[in-house]
Amino acid sequence: MNLHSHSISSLQGALTVPGDKSISHRAAILGGLAEGVTEVDNFLCSEDCLNTLRAMEQLGAKVDVLEERQGYGPVRFRITGVAMSPKAPERPIDCGNSGTGMRLLAGMLAACPFDSEMFGDASLSSRPMGRIMQPLEQMGARIEARGAKPGCAPLSIHGGRVHPISYTLPMASAQVKSAILLAGMFADGTTTVRQPAVTRDHTERLFRHFGVPCTVDGLTVGTCGPALPVAHDLTVPADISSAAFWMVAAASRPGSRLTLRQVGLNKTRNAVISALQRMGARMDIVPTSPEDAGEPYGDITVYGSDSLHGTSLLPEEIPNLIDEIPILAVAGALGRGDFIVRNARELRVKETDRIATTAANLRLMGVDVEEFDDGMVVHGGTPLKGTELSSYGDHRIAMSFLVAGLSAQGETVVTDAECINTSYPGFERDLAQFL
């Protein structure tokens, strides 16, 4: 599927983007492990999250759909958990394109008294899994990576009784941290994870939401097992990573006034807001979540202008806006001066090499980009030219450059854009209302 965009005058009105991908994965897993029935609302019915939900069904959780998004899947459902006693799956678990799903499920499966297998698509099968294998094997699991590339999926997991560990992450990774904590729920004793930098804390927040012990002491996070999550209804906020596309679209078109509703405002995810504000974007943020919400959320109104300019992303920001770097690079191209990203080597092992794919597409639009092993410098200020671009099968690349097309001269075509359903089902519809 190819999608098209073209230059527009401004963006007006209000928009509600789909539920948060990171939180939806964790809601499916913890709701599926819990004792009792959890109602989940505003679940992200994308391919990635639906694969995780199906995996929990394979492991014994029961899902009753209450509301579906036509053509996509459940956005509201009740999940009856297995009370920390998953059953052995009858077939290998398909994680599709989702590194989050595979890594988090591996943490849980490592502690289960049966063998299991997980696989994914070609992109997922090239992404590094050794980073979770090492700590989980220290906890007592046996994991075989059977992919064509060393340390890559498919994974064969020989689970069983795990023991607690104290582990220091070699890189800032919320996925690895979460895999260890999920395994730690099954262990007898305290498991701790020390991070080199703060990473998104959705797992810690949802542990508390479901009554699982969780401690945070500076950069060290811990849990004490064995723990039994207790069912607790949850509303998933709108995904700030998906909202970021529209923040940039509105901020870069003078005269725009666009309100994004019920966007997650977790402080470990809002670095994209800080970065855009440093670049000259003007926003009003109104918190709207109740006191007992598992995750904070609110409405963000973005005002367009012609005064965007470059910035340097701070090293401590990188783990918390890693998914937004492609769209921030587009913002940098649309502004004046240099947009600088360093210390972001992790981009090389996302769904695509996002340093290379972002730089390649920007160059095709006429932008001067310097590429480094761990980042890039985007020299902004040159008018963008519409052209045909590849998504490279990467949802965030596809959406970033369709947004770029809203400020480009001529038509922009992004090929193989069906990958957007990985994280944002309905993006095509939302885009169409502004064209």
UniProtKB/Swiss-Prot annotation:
Its EC number is 2.5.1.19. One of its GO terms (molecular function) is 3-phosphoshikimate 1-carboxyvinyltransferase activity. Catalyzes the transfer of the enolpyruvyl moiety of phosphoenolpyruvate (PEP) to the 5-hydroxyl of shikimate-3-phosphate (S3P) to produce enolpyruvyl shikimate-3-phosphate and inorganic phosphate. The gene is aroA. It comes from Akkermansia muciniphila (strain ATCC BAA-835 / DSM 22959 / JCM 33894 / BCRC 81048 / CCUG 64013 / CIP 107961 / Muc). This is 3-phosphoshikimate 1-carboxyvinyltransferase. The active site is at D323 (proton acceptor). Keywords: Amino-acid biosynthesis, Aromatic amino acid biosynthesis, Cytoplasm, Transferase. Pathway: Metabolic intermediate biosynthesis; chorismate biosynthesis; chorismate from D-erythrose 4-phosphate and phosphoenolpyruvate: step 6/7. Monomer. GO terms for biological process: amino acid biosynthetic process; aromatic amino acid family biosynthetic process; chorismate biosynthetic process. SUPFAM superfamilies: EPT/RTPC-like. Its main location: cytoplasm. GO terms for cellular component: cytoplasm. Belongs to the EPSP synthase family. It comes from the Bacteria. It is an enzyme of class 2 (transferase). It catalyses: 3-phosphoshikimate + phosphoenolpyruvate = 5-O-(1-carboxyvinyl)-3-phosphoshikimate + phosphate.
